């Protein structure tokens, strides 16, 4: 354990023969192990005893919280439990008719819960074919689409101090910490020692980071809400407008300052130069909603056809959405719409 490529070891046998061993290649093997086995206490067969989902879920949460070394954070989520760990893990149940498990993929939207963590993303696979996959993101009612805040952090031993101006968090609030720089541990933490512009969290590992490093902080918000279609996480969603055709818009006669110069009267009007907004990919992946084929190619001609802009590039004619002239992305990955 711990050997890497080019490591060497010298061994001398009992007969005095010295051998030098050099590691020429190595691979890391990941094995699976059970972190915990949890079951609620057995219920009585007495019909007079009341058995509730709240009682069963509360018992499972208490049992899981009481097991040390799992590094799994358990939170109540309506008639279910939300489990989080910075390390990969899986969950199984022998009673699939009584308990459903939602991870990063589901077979149908019928498998999705009505109460979940705000921002949770799943892939709906539908079938073995990739052409009908799409992605959904959970939005808790009454919470803004984007609640991630950007700040810096330092670390002393197990305590991480995060600085975000007017963060609005309270002690015991849960947050998801994403350390984009440095050696902080990405995980869910409880807020402690908060002030208006700083707060602390305590992790499981120790270290020292004196120079502030960048991080993203997302408050954990769990509640009832809806699932909305989104793009696959990590995929590019915008077109670089500096590489696309520009817009020239004629403006009425007036006095204008062009390129920072002095105000000049233009009695015949002028043309304003701008970069159009070429829309965003807000659903699908590279199969169900790929980048327009003119990306990386030369646009040879532009025409206007039935309320669409058409671009000729290489051997393709690429059409925008109707009445949305600069948007070349599909409207949805769930079906072929009239706008596609």
Regions found by a protein language model. Give the residues of each.
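Beta-propeller and closely related beta-pinwheel folds
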Residues: 276-307, 312-340
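Acidic/polar, low-complexity linker and loop regions
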Residues: 1-8, 25, 29-35, 39-41, ...
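Conserved beta-strand position repeated once per blade in WD40 beta-propeller domains
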Residues: 19-20, 301
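Small/polar beta-strand repeat architecture
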Residues: 86-116, 143-253, 266-267
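Polar, low-complexity export/assembly segments characteristic of proteins
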Residues: 23-25, 29, 34, 38-42, ...
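Residue-level recognition of conserved beta-strand edge/terminus positions
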Residues: 30, 177-179, 312
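Conserved loop/turn at the beginning of each blade in beta-propeller domains
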Residues: 4, 12-14, 295
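Ser/Thr/Gly-rich low-complexity blocks that favor extended beta-strand/coil architectures
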Residues: 36, 54-76, 115-127, 134-141, ...
């Amino acid at each position: 354990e711990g050997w890497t490529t080019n490591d060497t070891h010298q061994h001398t046998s009992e007969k005095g023969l010295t051998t030098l061993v050099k590691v020429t290649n190595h691979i890391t093997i990941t094995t699976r192990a059970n972190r915990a086995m949890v079951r609620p206490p057995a219920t009585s067969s007495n019909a007079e005893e009341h058995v509730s989902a709240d009682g069963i879920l509360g018992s499972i949460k208490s049992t899981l919280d009481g097991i040390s070394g799992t590094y799994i954070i358990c939170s109540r989520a309506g008639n279910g439990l939300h489990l989080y760990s910075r390390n990969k893990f899986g969950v199984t149940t022998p009673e699939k008719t009584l308990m459903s498990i939602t991870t990063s993929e589901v077979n149908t939207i019928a498998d999705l819960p009505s109460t979940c963590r705000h921002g949770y993303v799943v892939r709906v696979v539908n079938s073995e074919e990739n052409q009908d996959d799409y992605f959904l993101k959970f939005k808790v009612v009454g919470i803004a689409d984007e609640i991630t805040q950007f700040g810096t952090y330092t670390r002393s031993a197990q305590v991480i101090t995060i600085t975000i101006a007017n963060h609005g968090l309270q002690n015991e609030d849960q947050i998801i910490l994403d350390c984009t720089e440095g050696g902080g541990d990405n995980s869910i933490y409880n807020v402690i020692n908060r002030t208006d512009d700083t707060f602390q969290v305590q992790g499981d590992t120790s270290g020292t980071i004196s120079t502030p490093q960048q991080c993203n902080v997302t408050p954990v918000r769990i509640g009832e809400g809806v699932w909305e279609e989104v793009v696959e996480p990590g995929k590019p969603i915008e077109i670089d407008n500096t590489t696309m055709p520009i817009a020239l818009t004629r403006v009425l006669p007036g006095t204008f300052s062009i390129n920072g110069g002095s105000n000049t009267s233009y009695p015949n009007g002028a043309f304003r130069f701008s970069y159009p907004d070429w829309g965003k990919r807000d659903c699908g992946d590279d199969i169900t909603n790929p980048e327009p084929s003119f990306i990386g190619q030369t646009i040879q001609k532009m025409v206007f056809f039935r309320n669409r802009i058409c671009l000729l590039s290489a051997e393709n004619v690429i059409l925008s959405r109707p009445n949305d002239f600069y948007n070349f992305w599909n409207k949805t990955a769930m079906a072929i719409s009239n706008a596609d």
